[in-house]
Each structure stands twice: as structure tokens, then as C-alpha cells.
């Protein structure tokens, strides 16, 4: 398996008490599996493999996320503390898979066990000539939060979030969570 993960971000003070932060992250992964089986016989077990076989599978996944957040902090009249957060987030995940198998290897040599060296009849129903898959998902969000406290003793918080997802039902692509 090979995996590459990274995050980049930056933050600036826009005005006194107002900050803007933007970040981008990614996760890229490649993985797979290969296998082979040569003929063998287990005496009195009834578990014989009379033909060689080989299989291979490759997978790739990619995810990215971007987030932008404005944060406002203000203390007034000595004991009143207010924080307001507004933000936007988006992410996407994509996955691809490709696989296949074959039978009747030309040689029983592990170093030569690959699908190209198998000669099973193409009409053989066991031959898994190839399959693939593709999946993706997206999520977009807008969110806000207000925090207020008096003298760091009495606190109240309100949060709202609106998400849109490719995985939500066809007539309900967006929802509000509070």
C-alpha cells in the first residue's frame, strides 16, 4: 500500500478580533493484492486443486477537503465575551477498483505467476476476465456558531449547519442541523 497525506493552511488577522483561516487537505492511497495457487493434492482430505490460478486487484482512493473559517472574538464591558464562527467546507472522495483472475498458468513458477501467463479457455465460466468499480461522494457544508459567556461563568452556545451531500436522497440533497 502507498499512501500520501498532506494538509496546507494559512491564517490572517483581517481586523482586530477577526481571523480568517483556510485549509486544504488530501489523502491519496493505492493498494491491491495479487495471488496465485498451484495444483496440489492432500491425501484423504478431498481438497485437491487440479489447476493453477492467478488473480490480481488494484485500488485507488483520493479524498480532498477544503475549509474556510472566519472567527470573531470580542470582549466588551469587561465580563462579556462573544465568539462568532462562520465557515464553509467541501470534500470529495473518489474510489476506483480493477481486478481479474485466470486459470491454467503456463509454468508453476511464482516469479511468473501473472494473468498474462495463464491460458484458460476464454469461454471457461471460472475466468474472471475483469471487473471494476467506481464510487464517489461529495459533501458541502456551511456552518455557524455563536458563543457568549459572562465572566467565564455563565455560557450559552448556538450552532447551525447546512450540509449538502451526494449520499442524501434524491429529493433531499440538503439538510439543516441545529
Describe the role of every protein-language-model region:
Residues 1, 35-52, 96-129:
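Surface-exposed loop/turn segments flanking beta-strands in extracellular/periplasmic regions
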Residues 2-76, 137-178:
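Surface-exposed extracellular loop regions of Gram-negative outer-membrane beta-barrel proteins
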Residues 80:
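Histidine-centered active-site/metal-ligand motif
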Residues 83-87:
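Long, low-complexity, repeat-rich, intrinsically disordered, solvent-exposed domains used
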Residues 90-94:
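Glycine-rich, aromatic-flanked loop segments that form ligand/cofactor-binding clefts
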Residues 132-133:
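Flexible beta-alpha connector loops of hexameric P-loop NTPases
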